[in-house]
Amino acid sequence: MDSRTGENITAHQAENSVFIWEVPNPLYFKIMRVEDPAYTRTRIYHIQIRFNHNLRKALDLHKAFLNFQVWTTSIQASGTTYLNRFRLLVLLYLHRLGVIGINNVIRAVQFATNKSYVNTVLENHDIKYKFY
């Protein structure tokens, strides 16, 4: 859903893509925080994927922040270690696919989190399209 207008994103907008070699450094990965709930063997990584300016311009986006909460049983990996592994798998999927768009990034995250140590992935996205 477009967070500015409240309208649903159409299938055409969600599947709109650009070749990955046309946009240098298309994604910015940021770990927001790491939670270690007390008395559990889980670790929660809050990860944000941001589309860079050139990718947003190519896809007619005003803002695109994809927020993920990854619940894992991997308590050995620090935040930066997990983020590097996560980023590598997402970019590997996208480079093999050859195109990058909103739905393709979400599919790449599903590929990166399809591991035995990942319990749950929660998504909360902030996407705004250009009016003009």
Swiss-Prot record:
One record GO biological process: viral process
Keyword Transmembrane helix tagged: no
InterPro entries per record: Gemini_AL3
Keyword NADP appears in the UniProt entry: no
This protein's UniProt keywords: Host-virus interaction
Complexes and interactors: Homooligomer. Interacts with the replication-associated protein (REP). Interacts with host proliferating cell nuclear antigen (PCNA). Interacts with host retinoblastoma-related protein 1 (RBR1), and may thereby deregulate the host cell cycle. Oligomerization and interaction with PCNA are necessary for optimal replication enhancement.
Reported function: Increases viral DNA accumulation. Enhances infectivity and symptom expression.
Family per similarity comment: Belongs to the geminiviridae replication enhancer protein family.
Protein known as: Replication enhancer protein
Organism encoding this protein: Bean golden yellow mosaic virus (isolate Puerto Rico) (BGYMV)
